Structures are given as structure tokens and as C-alpha cells.
Amino acid sequence: MNDSCDITFKEKVNIFSFEYLKCIIFIISFDDDDEYVFTKKLYSKLVTTSRILEDFLDFHGAKKNKDWVFYREIAATIQHLALACYSQRHVLNRLMFYSFESDQQETFKKEAFDTLKIIQKSIKLAGSVALEEARRLDISVPDRGYDISFFPGISSDQQLDHNIDDFNARDKQKENLTRIATEFLEVVKEFDQFAFYERYDLKKIYELVPQHINEVSIRRYEMLIHNIQSSFDSYVVNDESSSQNLMLEQLRSHFSIVFHILQVLGRLLHFYERHLYDTGYKDVYKNVSISLSYLLDPNVLLDRAVNFCLFYAWKFLSSGKALASRILNENMETSIIEVTIPKDRGFHSRPSLLVAKIVQHYGGEVKMVVNSDVFDAASVLDIQWAGGKIIKEEIENVQFKGDVRALEDLKILASVNYGEDHMGKGIPLPKELSYLS
């Protein structure tokens, strides 16, 4: 391994800054009213050059040095804003290929483009400051920026033919779709805590961020959606042109767009929490934070994070719920079981709630059959209606038909008298039903 320690810090900072500053010179060459939208290749170059510069500066302790900390923070700012823009640009590039049943695509497209331009403008402002800092620190600045031809867009005048015919065994395909649709519905259910129907004002946003909405919580959902999409791409194959094939394309579109929106949201929240949010630091760090707030107004940043990113992430998750439920019900393994009713007290509140929670946990359709009448086993109210019929007609056994996964757990629940003793008091449930606790 070559030992390069004989190269001074001063010489190395020039090396690690060169391509970064060359990008900066290119992006600030455009007037504010210029309609040029940065390409993914440009964002990628900004990300890689700013990241390696930030790593270099961190290695040499720039975060603890009052002369170098601001140059380092500007590089980190450009990196995270460029990452957000890369994901946002990806969404806009792919929007025509997404398959949605939504009628709000044009509204989303306009808001997405406006948000991209806002962040792009902030990168330009940060770039100007980066150049000033480079000159203050006597860093060599390139004579010129890159030529615009170095950053072409990704589209061209043709699409390659789809000539690979993959096919999964139908039984395996059904199993995979059942699992993936269930996981998606679980995320939708959990993410529903963030649901809102009217745009938040700034007062409400500052109450939510970062106490309730923050980078850590959003990164978790980003990873969950990414795992579902990865599983879909690995184990589900669109085998032919059919109605189900269209549904699968629509489902994957929901995975993809939500994943990339959450990427943007995560980067914006990271920038706010790490660089703008007042965590009690004083003096140098406080001054750095104030300086960065001039590059991207915290009010604007949080408005876009919440009223654009969070809103549309929830919107696209919600619009995929019915589709995922349909795919689940068409592909899940089904069966029918017959079990006894709860002894002594019948289907009152506790047994009805436990039955409904089991069905809701798996997400697939399950019906409760009482003689010739059919009830929704996911509905506590429906089960209690059935309970009245059971008492009136002195019925001792009922049937459940539908999602075999839920039926297995319903058999376990019935075997312990639906979680209560003969007096109607709750008893411990088997470990297989621990998710009901």
C-alpha cells in the first residue's frame, strides 16, 4: 500500500475539493430565472464529490475546527439536498411509467416539480457560499465548471424490447403475493397515524417535527417499504398480459413512489434536525446553523417535508390499500373450519374483539358462517350480531371460512375458550397469539 502521508493537508484538500468545486461552478453559472432542471447525473456527481470531501474533512477534525467547520457543513448540506433531489428527480422521470388508478397525478406532478425547484435553488445558494469559503481558506478553485454535455438526462429516443419471458410456478407466486400484500397492508395500517386531509400550518408543523415526525421514524418506514419492494422484485414475476398483471404493476408503482418520497422526506428531516434545529449548541455551531438557514428557509423546508412528502406518502399508501387487499384475497390459501362457540357467555365483547383482531392481523377476508347466515369476521359488530342469532337459535358450533393463516389462529383461540374462563374473566393466551396482547 502506498504511503501518501507525505502529502500535506493543504495539498489534499485541493485534490478532494477540485471536482466538487467544478460542479459548484457549473451549477451557479445558471441565472435564477433559468429553466434548466438538474439531471440525475449532476445530482449524483454532487453527492459523490461532496461526500468524499466531507469524509476527508471529518477525518482531519474539521467539525471541531472553527476555521473549517463551515466549509464542511456546506459540503454536508449540498450532499443531503442533492440526495433528496436525486430521489425527487427519479420520481418525476418515472411518473409516466407508474400505473395508478389515481386522478390526482397531474396535481402531484406539479407539486413535485415545484418542490424540486425549491431544493435546487437552495443547492445553488449553498454552492455560492461554498466557493466563498474555498477562497477564504485559500483552496484552489478550478478555472471553469463542467460543460453541460457532461450531465445529460437519462431519457432517449427509444425503449428496449421486453423479450425476457419469466414465469414463476403459480402456487409459489400466490404464496409470495400473499406474504407481500400482507406486509404492505401492515405498513399502511401503521402509517395511518400520520394521516391528514388538510395542509398543516407552520404552528402545527413545528409541534410535530421533530417530536412526532423525525428522521428516525421516517427511515424505518423507508426501510420497510424498500424491503417489500425488494421482495416483490425478487419473488414476483409478471408472467403475461392479464388483469392480474395490471394489478401487480399498480401495486409495485405504489411501493416505488412511496419509497422514493420517503427518501426525500428523510433527507429533508435529516438536514433540518442535524443542521437547523436548535439543540442547545452555542457560539460557533449556533452561527453555522443560522448561516445555513439562509440557504434553505426552515419554514419552507418543513412545509415541503410535511405538506408534500408526508402527505403524498400517506396518500399513495392509502390508495394502494384496496388494491393490496384484492391481490391478497385472490392469492391467499383458503379453507374452512368448524369450532365451538365461547362457553357460557357466547360472543360478547372480548371473544368478538379477539376474533376480529386475528382476522385484521392477517388482512385476508374471513367470513363467519352461522347456519345459512354469513358475517364479516373482521367486524366486532358483525360478530356480536351473529352472537345474538347463536343465542336465539341455541347454536353450539360455527364455521369460519377464508384466509387459512387466520383460521389456524382461530382454532387455537377456540381451543382456549376465546381467552376467558367460565366466569368471563380473561386468561393468558397461547404464545402463538401473543400479537393480540
Specify the residue positions occupied by each region the protein language model found.
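Long, compositionally biased, glycine/small-hydrophobic-enriched stretches that function as flexible linkers
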Residues: 1-324, 424-425, 432-437
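Short amphipathic
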Residues: 333-343
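C-terminal basic regulatory modules in eukaryotic proteins
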Residues: 406-425, 430-437
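Amphipathic alpha-helical interaction surfaces in cytosolic regulatory modules
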Residues: 345-362, 373-393, 406-418
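Beta-strand/loop-dominated core regions that host nucleotide or nucleotide-derived cofactor-binding catalytic loops
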Residues: 393-401
